[in-house]
C-alpha cells in the first residue's frame, strides 16, 4: 500500500485518467474529490461492505424460511 501525505488542494494521479484531489481537511475529516472516467466504478468501501452484509443476511433469512417450510411439511405428513 502506498501511503502519501497531501495538503489541501494537492492532487494525486492514478493511471492516466483518475485524479484524486484533497478538497478540504477539517478536524477528523478529509474531503476528497475524485475525477474518473464514467466506466470506472468509484464506491465508498464501507457502503459496499454494508450491502454485502445485508445480502448475506437476506440469503440466510431465505434459507431459514426454506428449512421452516421443510419442517412444517414433516409435521404435516406425520
From Swiss-Prot:
- What Gene3D superfamilies does the record point to? Translational regulator CsrA
How does the record describe its quaternary structure?
A: Homodimer; the beta-strands of each monomer intercalate to form a hydrophobic core, while the alpha-helices form wings that extend away from the core.
Q: Where's it mainly located?
A: cytoplasm
Molecular function (GO) terms for this protein are:
mRNA 5'-UTR binding
Per the record, the GO terms for biological process are: bacterial-type flagellum organization; mRNA catabolic process; negative regulation of translational initiation; regulation of bacterial-type flagellum assembly; regulation of carbohydrate metabolic process
Q: Which family does it belong to?
A: Belongs to the CsrA/RsmA family.
Q: Where in the cell is it found?
A: Cytoplasm
A GO cellular component annotated for this chain's UniProt record is:
cytosol
Q: Write down what this protein is called.
A: Translational regulator CsrA
S-S bonds: none
NCBIfam families hit by this protein: csrA
Q: What does this protein do?
A: A translational regulator that binds mRNA to regulate translation initiation and/or mRNA stability. Usually binds in the 5'-UTR at or near the Shine-Dalgarno sequence preventing ribosome-binding, thus repressing translation. Its main target seems to be the major flagellin gene, while its function is anatagonized by FliW.
Q: Which UniProt keywords apply?
A: Bacterial flagellum biogenesis, Cytoplasm, Repressor, RNA-binding, Translation regulation
Any one Pfam family here would be CsrA
Amino acid at each position: 500500500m502506498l501511503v502519501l501525505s497531501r495538503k489541501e488542494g494537492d492532487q494525486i494521479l492514478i493511471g492516466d485518467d483518475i485524479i484524486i484531489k484533497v478538497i478540504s481537511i477539517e478536524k477528523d475529516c478529509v474531503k476528497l474529490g475524485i475525477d474518473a472516467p464514467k466506466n470506472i466504478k468509484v464506491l465508498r468501501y464501507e457502503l459496499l461492505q454494508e450491502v454485502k452484509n445485508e445480502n448475506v443476511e437476506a440469503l440466510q433469512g431465505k434459507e431459514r424460511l426454506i428449512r421452516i417450510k421443510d419442517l412444517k411439511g414433516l409435521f404435516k405428513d406425520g
